[in-house]
Each structure stands twice: as structure tokens, then as C-alpha cells.
Amino acid sequence: DGTMEIRMWEYDAQIALMNKEYRDGVLYVKFPDSAVIYLRSNSNTPDELKICVCIGQKELFYEIPILKVKNYTLEEIFEKELWMLIPFYIFRYEKEFRIINGDEERLRSLRMEYENVAARLDQECQSGRMKPITGGALCELANNVVEKLASKYGNVEKEVTEVMGGKVLNY
């Protein structure tokens, strides 16, 4: 319905105006390199939001990339330090919760994946690349997201929250 495009345009225009420059009597505004993060996406989800700005006879196309959480592997999240995606990593399994909830092997696999997440967060804190308060907050946020998202799937919720819920990272 264009709501997201309008919001992004407004946010970016505000940022551009805050950082405006006057050079030789000309106002320069530089729009930020923004992106939108989609927690849920499917094959119909576009790769970018598009806005066309018409000025007289000229058209300027403004494109805002869409980052889809499910397209990022854990390896990429840690490699690129996209840690803010960790709490939402569980969204990739949302459509499979019913199946995972009743399948011991899939539950074990999910738990192992989150044990890996917790271990990687621990490593990031020990190495000094991440502050312990950030690691703890990510664990808590991941736990909160799982509790809400998987509330109807007790086994899924239990396996992930047992791993992420009790993590206290002190260094």
C-alpha cells in the first residue's frame, strides 16, 4: 500500500536535511544508505522498495534495499557482525513449528543450532568483538521472540529458551 515507502522517504529526508550542506550557494542533501529488514518474506517479497521522485520532466528513482532475515545464514550473521538479526533468526522456522514440535530429531537439531548461537555469542564476548551486555541482551531478546512466536509449540519454545534463556555472559 506504499506505507513503508512513505515512512522510509520521510525518515531519510529528515536525516538528509539534518546533514545538509551549503556549497557555493547550493543546498546539498545526501540521503542515507538505508535498508528495510523484513522478518518474514516469501517469493513475492521484492528485493527493494522503489520510489519515483518527479521534478518537472525529470524522474529520479530512489531504491531502498530489503534485507530478508531468512536469507542470512548464522555464518553470515556472525561474519558480518549482523548480530541484531540473531533474535529474529527463529523466524526462518516459523512455518515448520508444527512439524518440528512433534519430531524429536528436528527438535534436537534446532536445539543444537541454538547451542551453536550461544557458543558463538560467548566467543564474540571473550574475543572482545562484542560487549557482554550486548551478548546478554541478544540472548534475552532471542528468548522473548521465541516465547511469543512459538507460544503454541511448547517443545520448540522449551528447547530454544533452555539454551538462550539462561545465558549470562560475564567477562
Model-derived features: positions:
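Conserved single-residue anchors adjacent to enzymatic active/cofactor-binding motifs
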Residues: 1-168
